Amino acid sequence: MNRRNFSKLAALSSFVGLAPSQIFSSPNYDDHLKISLAQWSLNKAIKAGQLSGLDFAKKSRSFGIEGIEYVSGLYTTHSNLLEKMSMNKLSDELLKRSNDYGIDNVLIMIDGQGNLASSNKKERLEAIDNHMRWIDFALKLGCETLRLNLNGEKNLDKWTDNSVKSLSTLSEYNKNINVVVENHGGFSSNGKYLANVMSNVDIINCGTLPDFGNFCMDGSPRNCNNWYDKYKGVEELMPYAHAVSAKSYHFDENGDETTIDYKKMIDIVKKAGYKGYVGIEYEGNILSEDEGIVATKKLLEKLI
């Protein structure tokens, strides 16, 4: 179903007293924002072997956080868990542990599975196949959303066309999961460019994951040559959002994030009518990972 038809049926739903989210397969959230934990917040501990990726649900519960966002690379590139276990066995074990601790498997972030925006058709189709395997994995976990990246092309027009093709295929592959793109470097960190891709795909389960901090178009966040305005970017991406990432780096003595105006960001999120999870993604170097997660959680709790 495309967005135009969704809008028509959403309007119709008002006559029978139902919200669009009660008609379609949108998450059945309470009427407020909820806090989840992105696994990347714990990437240092996992890479160092101090925390097993299998214990993510347990760790999240220790913070009093009931929703989790997996990162595929922490089971492949940065650990050997997937070498030891098949994808089926890994998903079974993660699902069991999340159920044991009463944790919602919110989404999974997919990295390193090929260039979905490549102009090399063979390469792009291979990337699509790789991501389809992870869609199956995510569905088995009960995730409502899968996040992917749009890499592989430096020409904007070609990047846009290739991205639309790949996203359309993956969104149609299984309508029971949201396929979303995060602003994650390159053209995707330009809110206008990524919103244009979404407009062209026009499929209801295809959308965005606006990240409060990932708006560096050239370079890295700590050494960036070209920043896109993060508040403008989040505002442009929120109409398509199926998830939101609360990036954080450093906090002052009052508990406020020093690089991002969190109140302004949360106001943008609320104004868009978003009712889902907001995922903590701490990437700072001053506080420990645990301390950064707690600080971000406290700040979000004040604002949501």
Outline where the language-model segments fall.
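Glycine-rich, proline-tolerant flexible connector loops at the mouths of alpha/beta enzymes
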Residues: 69-94, 150-154
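Short, acidic/polar
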Residues: 47-60, 125-136, 226-234, 262
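Active-site acidic/histidine proton-transfer and metal-coordination neighborhood
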Residues: 10-17, 61, 91-210, 216, ...
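Acidic/histidine-rich catalytic cores of soluble enzymes
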Residues: 67-68, 164-267
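Catalytic domains of carbohydrate-active enzymes, especially glycoside hydrolases
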Residues: 54-73, 142
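N-terminal export signals
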Residues: 4-26
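Hydrophobic faces of well-ordered beta-strands that scaffold small-molecule active sites
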Residues: 33-39, 68-70, 105-110, 146-148, ...
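C-terminal segment of N-terminal export signals and the immediately downstream linker at the start
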Residues: 21-51
